[in-house]
A protein has these predicted regions:
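The feature captures the catalytic groove of carbohydrate-active enzymes
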Residues: 1, 106-119, 126, 150-206
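Acidic/polar, glycine-enriched structural segments that form the non-catalytic walls/loops
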Residues: 1-58, 354
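Long, well-ordered core segments of solenoidal/helical folds
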Residues: 26-38, 76-99, 129, 141-162, ...
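Acidic/His metal-coordination segments adjacent to aromatic residues that form catalytic metal sites
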Residues: 46-54, 95-112, 163-179, 236, ...
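Aromatic-rich carbohydrate-recognition surfaces in CAZymes
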Residues: 56-159, 184, 330-353
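C-terminal capping/lid segments that line or modulate ligand- or cofactor-binding pockets
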Residues: 57-60, 110-127, 240-260, 282-354
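Extended ligand-binding clefts on enzyme/binding-domain cores
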Residues: 62, 148-151, 158-159, 176-188, ...
Length: 354
């Protein structure tokens, strides 16, 4: 039928039937449940999930919309991805990263996250790279958003050190210290994009991303030598936090080119994180860290776990039990998009096989 053919056209392949099932079930859910269209205005809206059993409902963070849902949609439909990117800029680009919004852009929960403005740059660059449509930066609303995002990030730079401060983690939790590892890794990647997409005069004033990455190694590494590991947040006066954030986890650093996944400092930090995260009662835990581990040294083990995990009838849930069964906030469309794209990326970019 025409419907079946249309759905098949959206599906992706990884070379593994097992991985294909995980990718495509979650990709299609993100495609249809992470995006809505207004009955009154016919405009597109990015949401956390249209599933009525998900508590976040029709709210959205810039980071989740642009870095979780959009990459999955883009795998299946670059035309829709373009419309969604422009629409996100229209609704949220005037004040990127300010917190949780309702679908119409009204602020629901305030709290500035440095990942928000960076996400607009990274999402634009990913779209250009995948679609070869570099004319999107000529769209006035996209161009304005990139300039505003660059200004917001620049305003957060420390006076002495090329690191950038935030108020909350991308999960919404208050940052224990103003300079976060995940936030600065993301900023470094965004700065690369600004250097390529802003006009010559503005681009010349953008911080060198290499300087930010060097500062990350210098200021976030705690201990030294063979015991060195990465802190999650610091204040640049000697205080540091090792408590990882479920959304802004250090596990994601290779994706932002901050550290290679084979880097010894990264691997030690991941091992320490796994040891400390092994709580005595792991009956309920976020699914997100498991997805992030697909980028690290435990990728094969995590993939085997995902093969067995029931999730929410195969769809990502925010909270799961030790076996991967959905406990709360099932039908998480944005998280389903992240799961689909991360498994696809692990297969195509990292060579992961089931």
């Amino acid at each position: 039928t025409a419907t079946r053919e249309a759905l098949l056209a959206l599906e992706q392949t990884t070379g593994s039937d097992v991985m294909d099932r995980i990718v495509n079930r979650n990709l299609l859910f993100a495609y249809f449940y992470g995006v809505g269209r207004g009955l009154d205005d016919a405009h597109y809206y990015l949401v956390r999930s249209r599933a009525p059993w998900h508590s976040m409902g029709c709210t959205v963070r810039d980071w989740e919309a642009l870095m979780w849902t959009l990459p999955a949609v883009q795998l299946a439909d670059t035309g829709l991805a373009r419309e969604l990117l422009v629409r996100a800029c229209e609704l949220h680009g005037y004040a990127p990263g300010q917190g949780v919004h309702y679908i119409d852009g009204t602020l629901f929960q305030p709290g500035f996250s440095i990942e928000g403005p960076a996400a607009f740059a990274i999402a634009t660059d990913r779209y250009i790279r995948d679609s070869e449509d570099d004319q999107i930066v000529e769209d006035p609303v996209v161009a304005d958003t990139l300039y505003l995002a660059s200004e917001d990030i620049t305003a957060r730079r420390d006076e002495r050190v090329p690191l950038y401060s935030t108020e909350v983690m991308p999960s919404g939790a208050p940052a224990k210290y103003p300079f976060t590892l995940h936030g600065n890794a993301v900023v470094a990647l965004a700065l690369e994009v600004f250097r390529r997409t802003l006009d010559e005069e503005a681009a010349a004033g953008v911080e060198d991303p290499a300087a930010v990455r060097a500062a990350i190694r210098r200021h976030f590494a705690v201990d030294r030598g063979e015991k060195a590991r990465l802190a999650v947040a610091v204040d640049l006066t000697g205080n540091a936090s090792l408590d990882d954030d479920a959304v802004g986890s250090l596990l994601w650093l290779p994706l932002y080119e901050a550290l290679d996944r084979d880097d010894s400092l990264y691997r030690r930090s991941v091992r320490a994180l796994r040891t400390e995260g092994a709580a005595p009662d792991a009956s309920v835990s976020p699914l997100l860290p498991q997805i992030a581990r697909l980028l690290g040294p435990e990728a094969q083990e995590v993939l085997a776990w995902l093969r067995r995990a029931p999730l929410d009838n195969g769809i990502a849930a925010e909270f799961v039990d030790a076996e991967g069964r959905a406990i709360a906030n099932g039908g998480d469309a944005a998280l389903a998009g992240l799961l689909a794209h991360t498994v696809w990326y692990a297969a195509h970019a990292l060579g992961l096989r089931a």
